């Protein structure tokens, strides 16, 4: 039996509500990122653009969790897609069963958010804690850092300033140990060496910190008119994995034997 939870249709959401557009953009940036991994030897510029995908998916997930009338169905759709996508994810990006795709993270984040919203028997505390415990036993794309990022954005959802502060603060922390991006498509980022300001700018140009490139898309209200069926928003994820497999076979020098070896 599904629990009763009043949807927050009048709940303030400070960011962009044009989620069909954001999901489409997220998929495009994720495809660029995965093409960089699968076909272009981890080309840095493509990985940079790929950092935009997770924040867009995270914000769309938050909007969906606030708006949904059926949280269990929302969670179930994500979990089903995650399970169905896993073999494709393994074949497209040469991962093993132990490395789970991003839809598992989004499903787990949904469980954490709905536990916070439910507020029954202290669920706002033990619900997220259980989700972190699951991450201790499962290797899921983006891991505990990704879950923390999504929860911070959820908690700051009602304030544009709060969203920006939570986003930038956590992105700076998350990216601090990743490599500094000093060139972009052959253009040297000379301002990173400016006296006095170079170190400050450099903090924002670590690879993972460059997720901040998604922030204007989240904060700027748009009205694209694009309407996407509920199932299609995340349903495009496995389709892009099929495309990656085909491209690897056609242009990446991969063979079927090599692609299915991930199941061994």
Where are the language model's segments positioned?
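Alpha-helical transmembrane segments and their immediate juxtamembrane cytosolic regions
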Residues: 1-264
């Amino acid at each position: 039996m599904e629990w009763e939870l009043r949807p927050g249709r009048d709940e303030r959401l400070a960011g962009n509500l044009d989620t069909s557009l954001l999901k489409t953009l997220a998929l495009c940036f994720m495809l660029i990122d995965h093409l960089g991994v699968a076909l272009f030897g981890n080309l840095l510029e493509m990985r940079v653009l790929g950092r935009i995908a997770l924040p867009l998916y995270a914000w769309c997930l938050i909007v969906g969790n606030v708006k949904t009338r059926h949280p269990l169905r929302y969670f179930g759709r994500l979990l089903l897609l995650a399970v169905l996508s896993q073999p494709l994810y393994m074949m497209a990006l040469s991962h093993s069963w132990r490395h789970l795709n991003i839809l598992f993270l989004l499903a787990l984040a949904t469980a954490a958010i709905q536990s916070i919203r439910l507020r029954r028997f202290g669920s706002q505390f033990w619900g997220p804690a259980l989700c972190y415990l699951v991450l201790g036993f499962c290797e899921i794309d983006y891991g505990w850092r990704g879950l923390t990022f999504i929860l911070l954005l959820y908690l700051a959802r009602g304030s544009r300033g709060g969203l920006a502060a939570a986003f930038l603060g956590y992105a700076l922390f998350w990216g601090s140990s990743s490599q500094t991006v000093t060139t972009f498509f052959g253009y040297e980022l000379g301002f990173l060496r400016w006296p006095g300001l170079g170190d400050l700018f450099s903090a924002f140009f670590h690879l993972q910190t460059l997720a901040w490139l998604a922030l204007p898309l989240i904060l700027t209200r748009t009205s694209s008119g694009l309407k996407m069926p509920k199932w299609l928003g995340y349903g495009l994820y496995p389709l892009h994995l099929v495309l990656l497999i085909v491209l690897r076979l056609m242009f990446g020098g991969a063979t079927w034997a090599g692609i299915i070896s991930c199941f061994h």
